[in-house]
Amino acid sequence: MSLSHGTGAPAISTPLTLRPPPDNTKAILTIAIGIAASLVFFMLTRNNLPHVGDNIHSLPHGGSYIDGTKSINYRPPASRYPSSNLLAFAPPILAAVLFFLTQPYLATRRSRCVRCFVVHGACTNHT
């Protein structure tokens, strides 16, 4: 018999309730997807073009400048720079994302029984 803090009353022991920790996987996955998408978008849209011009005149997208003492003629950037081809990659990326997002839905539709609409193996109980 144990005493509680010298009062003479027996200590009441309560059972510990065990609860699983909160499941934060959806929140972490959402944050990770957002960070990854923003990094990809940032890397595809940043300016990787070489510096053209001097400290006063900058022509990163092509053009010409003529004044009394100097002239500069620069062509626009070629298509080999990824920042100028951002929209060319959009349809394949969008198609891949839509494909992977619809796969769980299509997989559950294919495995459902056409008689009882339950997901299980071969439907042998409806003969």
Swiss-Prot record:
Coiled coil: none
Lineage, uppermost ranks: Viruses, Riboviria, Orthornavirae, Kitrinoviricota, Alsuviricetes
Main location: host cell
Subcellular location: Host endoplasmic reticulum membrane
Protein name listed in UniProt: Movement protein TGB2
Organism encoding this protein: Foxtail mosaic virus
Source domain of life: Viruses
Name of one Pfam family that matches: Plant_vir_prot
GO cellular component, one term: host cell endoplasmic reticulum membrane
Membrane side Lumenal: residue ranges: 46-85
More info: TGBp1, TGBp2 and TGBp3 seem to act together for cell-to-cell propagation. TGBp1 is the main movement protein that physically cross the plasmodesma with the viral genome. TGBp2 and TGBp3 would facilitate TGBp1 function.
